[in-house]
Amino acid sequence: MGAAGSKLEKALGDQFPEGERYFGFENFGNTCYCNSVLQALYFCAPFREQLLEHYANNKADAEENLLTCLADLFSQISSQKKKTGVIAPKRFVQRLKKQNELFRSYMHQDAHEFLNYLLNELVEILEKETQATKADNETSSSPEKIANVLKAPLANGVHKEPIVTWVHKIFQGILTNETRCLRCETVTARDETFLDLSLDIEQNSSITSCLKNFSSTETLHAEDKFFCDKCCSLQEAQKRMKIKKPPHILVIHLKRFKYMEQLGRYKKLSYRVVFPLELKLSNTVDEYVDIEYSLFAVVVHVGSGPNHGHYVSLVKSHNHWLFFDDESVEIIEESAVQTFFGSSQEYSSNTDHGYILLYESLGTR
């Protein structure tokens, strides 16, 4: 790897970003799903900053969990004396396998499932830490408060305010589900949070068209009728989903694995789906405001089927695009990103397809 590392340093020359580190990850037998996602998260600037800050403030008394193992790995990379090389994320992978049997086998795993699990696990750890800190602060002020603090959450069935962690602040958006009764025209809106958007895909489409389909109006009729509270009965209705609060980091998962009933198994959709380097989010509640996003990472699935294959990642760092394939790290041209859109033909020799896209908000325009 020394040679490959120095090759990358030579390629970047005096353009090598000050203080940045580019390290490949060792593969522990089919852990490419994990390596590719971790590289994407490492180059997600707000995530890396918050994780390292949290680690610096809490490492003395922290018991080991996925958060401490991930922070330890990121800290290890950022504090390397060398600019390039290989690191073994052994402690993190061991902890992951210890906690979740799904990732224990040497079978091919799903990168999106892993990302989803990891973000939710980090949220849970941070929420528990916040609750513990609150309880400590309240009980330390006066001993007689202890009994009240323990009873408080149960009293009168009071709804507790949800805890907003730094993971929420980075990745969480809000969707609003609007349903319009076609008899009385009453609109019912229900909000739900998301950490990523999973989009259905079609051949020769784009992220913009996939997002439009995601927010398209659907008519509920026959056995799918909607119970209208105003009419007090089941009625035909129109339903649509819009983005009420766009996240700072928008994670898009392209649903490339589809269950084929006639085959009785999943099939990979190699469809060509164009994802732009700059994305305007238009399916928002406020239709007059376009939110602009910039692509900074792509997790790519390599292979023709869902149960085998490989994951790699493309990452944008300081205006350079890098290609991470386990231990290997190479610089690539920005134009090379479009080779991962997918295939126009069903049977193609190109099996490297964008699977998870990470965009950072540039704000409103």
From Swiss-Prot:
Main enzyme class: hydrolase
GO cellular component annotations of the record: nucleus
Key word Protease present: yes
A Gene Ontology biological process term: protein deubiquitination
Motif Bipartite nuclear localization signal location, chain numbering: 81-98
Domain (USP) ranges: 23-362
Catalysed transformations (reactions): Thiol-dependent hydrolysis of ester, thioester, amide, peptide and isopeptide bonds formed by the C-terminal Gly of ubiquitin (a 76-residue protein attached to proteins as an intracellular targeting signal)
EC number: 3.4.19.12
PROSITE patterns in alphabetical order: USP_1, USP_2, USP_3
Disulfide pattern: none
Tissues and organs where the protein is expressed, per its UniProt entry: Constitutively and ubiquitously expressed.
Domain of life the protein comes from: Eukaryota
Main location: nucleus
Active site: C32 (nucleophile), H310 (proton acceptor)
CDD domains according to UniProt: Peptidase_C19G
Cited InterPro entries: Papain-like_cys_pep_sf, Peptidase_C19, Peptidase_C19_UCH, USP_CS, USP_dom
Chain's role: Recognizes and hydrolyzes the peptide bond at the C-terminal Gly of ubiquitin. Involved in the processing of poly-ubiquitin precursors as well as that of ubiquitinated proteins. Required for the correct development of pollen.
Name the UniProt record assigns to this protein: Ubiquitin carboxyl-terminal hydrolase 4
Species this chain originates from: Arabidopsis thaliana (Mouse-ear cress)
